[in-house]
Regions:
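Conserved thiamine diphosphate
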Residues: 1-59
Length: 59
């Protein structure tokens, strides 16, 4: 993913599909989503979101 800001575009699939795979089919869905996040990426004020809290509260 280019910037963490864009994770919101795929958040429905990540939360509603991947997070519930274990409960629906009894299988793990091991996924790594890599994206630059927070300050220090040199991307300006519009690409410096920190969305980690969303993922910490998803099963």
């Amino acid at each position: 993913m280019q910037f963490a800001d864009f994770v919101t575009c795929g958040f429905n699939q990540i939360v509603n599909n991947l997070a519930k795979t274990h409960y629906r089919w009894g299988q793990n869905a091991d996924v790594v989503v890599r994206m630059p996040t927070g300050a220090g990426t040199g991307a300006g004020p519009f690409h410096s979101q920190s969305n980690e809290a969303w993922f910490f509260h998803v099963p």
